Amino acid sequence: MNNKITINPCKNKVGAIIDADLNNADKNILSNIKEALNEYGVIFFRNQNLTTSQYIKFAKHFGKCADYPMLKSLDDYPEITVVEKKPGEKIMFGEGWHTDSTYTQSPPKITMLYSINTPTRGKGNTRFASQYLSYEKLDKNYKKKIENLKAIFSADGPISKTRNNRIAEKGKGVDPKSLLAEHSIVKINEYNGKKSIYLSPGHVTQLVGVEKK
């Protein structure tokens, strides 16, 4: 059993790489992982070999698993939705800047991805941006201007077209236009008090009270 953990921040203050055995993570390791997640926003685990059940067990250390409203899950594992690009498809599922399921009334606090087959070249990379840094770099006047703004998030936003192939294949029959939610665009992390921008170009359709130009 390996109960060691190392945490190495990535460049540009976006994310951290964590080396730990997630199959044998004790309370101390889990505490360190949660602290790193709140500090860096995104964390990466290398060289893991988890069964589906072990993956779900690890996920539940962070809270109840959310249901993805648009697509059917794995038959035996309702907590898991498969993200894939099939041969011949030109559109990448979920391609474009977004935060998952922000069009729901209670969006998940985190998203977990477990890579099984990843291309060695081309569009195999998932990119991440720090919304902590986005907020920090705003000047004081702009921070004040957006402090109480809210946005409308829609499942029928710009990124919805990337789901069409999967929905045709295994959609739940939900009308994306019916999934709308209003959220503040400045969020405060309840664990450390850090503020971040909560905007999703793939899902935001309108700023409340702000006229479109």
Where are these regions (language model features)?
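Non-heme Fe(II) oxygenase catalytic core, chiefly the N-lobe of the double-stranded beta-helix
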Residues: 2-213
